[in-house]
Every structure is written in structure tokens, then in C-alpha cells.
Amino acid sequence: MELNTFISRLFSAAEAAGIAPAEAACSQSDSFRVRVRRGELEDYQVSENAGLTLRGRVNGRIGTASTQALTEESIPLLIQGVLESAALIETDEQDDILPPDNSYASVCNDSEAVTALTAEQKIALAREIDEKLRSDDPRLTPDTCAVATGEETFTLKNTLGLDLSHHSNMIYAMANVVARDGEHAATDYETRWGYGLDAIDAETLAESCKRESLMKLEAGRMKSGAYPVVIKNSAMGDLLATFCGVFSADNVQKGPVSYTHLTLPTTERV
């Protein structure tokens, strides 16, 4: 069923069941992925997915229900799911259903260049990366490379007048090389992404992957102690990603939470 028609019928059924206001969030996505390993096309995947979540207020509580089938048969199941889940809610801390704001900031993260790419172009890029991964250095062995694209349309509507939709897409490529020297072995995994073929240079990606894997061959263990260090930007990014939850005000407010890494009173501004 066409999405707007489905949501319209869903809201009518929700109103008849005493669910007001009601809100529907829907994600529709397409993805493509090809993987090449040492000259051979190893994997090829094309998929389409859709998912819709209905939220609605019932007796002061907001219930939710989800489906992946936008069919007439799904509507009563969603309504029943919202009614049942709302009856189980015990907390007053819920994200409310709100009317639309006067305006919204524009975010552009899609490109016609990605949509226009053919499967043949993506496969050709993957094969080119695989070719560039090969090296005269006997220590280096190409492993795998992949090229993928993804597109998503996200729609958010409610019975208070909100009606928003956003389309996004991207292309990304990854390469993996194994380096061996005697008993030492290392691997490197590099990725690039953007909004068109011009964002991914096969040679640059492959050379970076080979260079980084060779650098890791020199790594070794160190005795415990205090050392001056220089941290690579990508390593610092991984470190911050691991511990970012420690700095979450939301997590602190939900307490009691004990963070051994960060002990601050919740009233102190930092």
C-alpha cells in the first residue's frame, strides 16, 4: 500500500480506538553491496526494507507498536499493540507527541549522483580497489574490498499536523590488507565514503591500507609505566567513541550511576 494512504487509514483507525494524538514514523531504505576478494566477486547483495512505528496516547500513557508490512491487515495489529503497550507503561518520563514547529533547519545529505550509479559502476570500482591492493611487496596480501550504497527516506507524521520527510543516501568503500613478516602479522581496515564516485579514489584507499598495515608490523609490547605518547587522530576517535557514554548528561540524570572515570556532582557545570 502507498505510504500516505496507509498512514491516513492508520490514523483514522487510531482515532476510532481512542488513541489521540497519534504519530507514525516510517523508514524506507534500499541498499546495495558487492564484495571482491583477490580478483573474485565474492558477494553481491541488493535489499529493500521498510519499517513503521505507531505511537499514540491512551489514558495519559503513550504506547508504541511496529510493523514491516504496510498492508491493510497490519492496521488493527498496530492499534492493538499501542493499546496493550500503553497499559503496561508505569513511568511518567515519555517523549510527548508534539505539533509542528514554525520552521525546520534544512539538512542536505543526499546526492543524485549516488542514485544514478549503476550496479556495473559499483562492481567496477570494487574490482579497481582490489587491483590496487595488490603489491610487489611479499609481506602484503590483499584480503577483501567492498563497495556499497544506501538510500533512506524517513517520514514522520502525526495527527497534530506534523508532516516531515527526509531523503538521504551515500556510497562507501572499504579495503582490507594483511601484512606478514616472519612471526609478526598485522591487518588494516580502511574506509571511504561520500556522495559520488569522485569521493572515493581507489588508489588512495589501497595505498593507505597497505601503508598502515606495514606500520603495524613494527608494533610491540611495552612494560607498564608512564610514557609520553602521541595519539593518532583515528585512535583518539575510537577512544572517545568507547567512553562517550561516561559524559552523557542523560545517563547521569537517570542515576544513580557510578562512573569511576568521571566523578562530578550533577550541579557542577563543566
Outline where the language-model segments fall.
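Single conserved hydrophobic/aromatic residue that forms the stacking wall/gate
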Residues: 261-270
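Active-site bordering "gate/hinge" segments
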Residues: 1-262
